[in-house]
Amino acid sequence: MRKRNISLKSKIEIQKIFKEGKLIRFSNLNLKMFYKSNHLVYSRILVTFSKGFRGSVKRNRIRRLFKEAFRKRLELLEGIALDIIFVVSYGKLTLTYFSIESLMKGLVLRCERGIGESK
């Protein structure tokens, strides 16, 4: 799969996910996840930050870590097409690659169950 297929970019689709998508909150990590099934064959991801999150270096590093963890866990989403938005709020973040990867695995499985129940 091409790298550009992983990113969610359309403003209309992003607004639709925020309005109609399901929400999972992680208050201990200052993280929210919105997800919704899509009409495509593959899943897409967007990592965004709250307004108070300063420092472009830190933001971009976290964004890269999320995208890489998602890319590696993509095989768990075989047959399920999701649009996923992560909203990272400012706080005492100690997000390492391994914590994000384990979080991603749990979230993907949780989304899979949520989509399965709604069918």
From Swiss-Prot:
Protein name listed in UniProt: Ribonuclease P protein component
Superkingdom per UniProt: Bacteria
InterPro entries: Ribosomal_Su5_D2-typ_SF, Ribsml_uS5_D2-typ_fold_subgr, RNase_P
Organism whose genome encodes this protein: Borreliella burgdorferi (strain ATCC 35210 / DSM 4680 / CIP 102532 / B31)
Gene designation per UniProt: rnpA
Family, similarity comment: Belongs to the RnpA family.
Oligomeric and partner information: Consists of a catalytic RNA component (M1 or rnpB) and a protein subunit.
Catalytic activity annotation: Endonucleolytic cleavage of RNA, removing 5'-extranucleotides from tRNA precursor
Pfam families (UniProt xref): Ribonuclease_P
GO molecular-function term, one example from the UniProt record: 3'-tRNA processing endoribonuclease activity
This protein's UniProt keywords: Endonuclease, Hydrolase, Nuclease, RNA-binding, tRNA processing
GO cellular component: ribonuclease P complex
Record Gene3D superfamilies: 3.30.230.10
GO BP annotations, alphabetical order: tRNA 5'-leader removal
EC number: 3.1.26.5
HAMAP family: RNase_P (MF_00227)
Protein task: RNaseP catalyzes the removal of the 5'-leader sequence from pre-tRNA to produce the mature 5'-terminus. It can also cleave other RNA substrates such as 4.5S RNA. The protein component plays an auxiliary but essential role in vivo by binding to the 5'-leader sequence and broadening the substrate specificity of the ribozyme.
Broad enzyme group: hydrolase
PANTHER family for the chain: RIBONUCLEASE P PROTEIN COMPONENT
